[in-house]
């Protein structure tokens, strides 16, 4: 029960701040985060902006969804998704952590949920 409550709370926080991580950070950390994001964009030839555009295009298609599989534990992975402003592109239900169950099990769950006609 305690674990279920914790995950409901995590889902609530994720959905609340998925399009506004600055609201969770507070003014001082938000400004530092925005500066860091600007530096990352400058050093990486705007990879995050381009990734967000691609993910946004995919999510607007009626028969497409974005799914994220990571070997990072779930809570840190969700934090990273929010910090990179990817929360709007990935519903929390479509983020899978392979840390405890392995990649193969994650992909089996994805196939059972979405079917085999996936790209």
Curated annotation (Swiss-Prot):
Q: What is its main location?
A: cytoplasm
Q: Which cofactor does it need?
A: Mg(2+)
Q: Does the keyword Repeat apply?
A: no
Question: Per its UniProt record, what InterPro entries does this chain match?
Answer: EYA (IPR028472), EYA_dom_sf (IPR038102)
Q: Could you give the cofactor binding note from the entry?
A: Binds 1 Mg(2+) ion per subunit.
Q: Write down the chemical reaction(s) this protein catalyses.
A: O-phospho-L-tyrosyl-[protein] + H2O = L-tyrosyl-[protein] + phosphate
What is one term from the GO cellular component aspect held by the record?
Answer: cytoplasm
Specify the superkingdom. Eukaryota
Return the EC number: 3.1.3.48
The Gene Ontology biological process annotation of the record reads: chromatin organization; DNA repair
Q: Which family does it belong to?
A: Belongs to the HAD-like hydrolase superfamily. EYA family.
| Role, per record | Tyrosine phosphatase that specifically dephosphorylates 'Tyr-142' of histone H2AX (H2AXY142ph). 'Tyr-142' phosphorylation of histone H2AX plays a central role in DNA repair and acts as a mark that distinguishes between apoptotic and repair responses to genotoxic stress. Promotes efficient DNA repair by dephosphorylating H2AX, promoting the recruitment of DNA repair complexes containing MDC1. Its function as histone phosphatase probably explains its role in transcription regulation during organogenesis. May be involved in development of the eye.
> What is the protein's name according to its record?
Protein phosphatase EYA4
What is the name of the gene encoding this protein?
Answer: EYA4
């Amino acid at each position: 029960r305690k674990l279920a409550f914790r995950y409901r709370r995590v889902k609530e926080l994720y959905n609340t701040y998925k399009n506004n991580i600055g609201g969770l950070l507070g003014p001082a950390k938000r400004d530092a985060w925005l500066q860091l994001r600007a530096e990352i964009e400058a050093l990486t030839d705007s990879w995050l902006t381009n990734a967000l555009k691609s993910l946004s295009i995919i999510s607007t298609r009626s028969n497409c969804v974005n799914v994220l599989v990571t070997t990072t534990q779930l809570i840190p992975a969700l934090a990273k998704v929010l910090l990179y402003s990817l929360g709007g592109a990935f519903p929390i239900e479509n983020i899978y952590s392979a840390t405890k169950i392995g990649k193969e099990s994650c992909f089996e769950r994805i196939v059972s949920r979405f079917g085999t006609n996936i790209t």
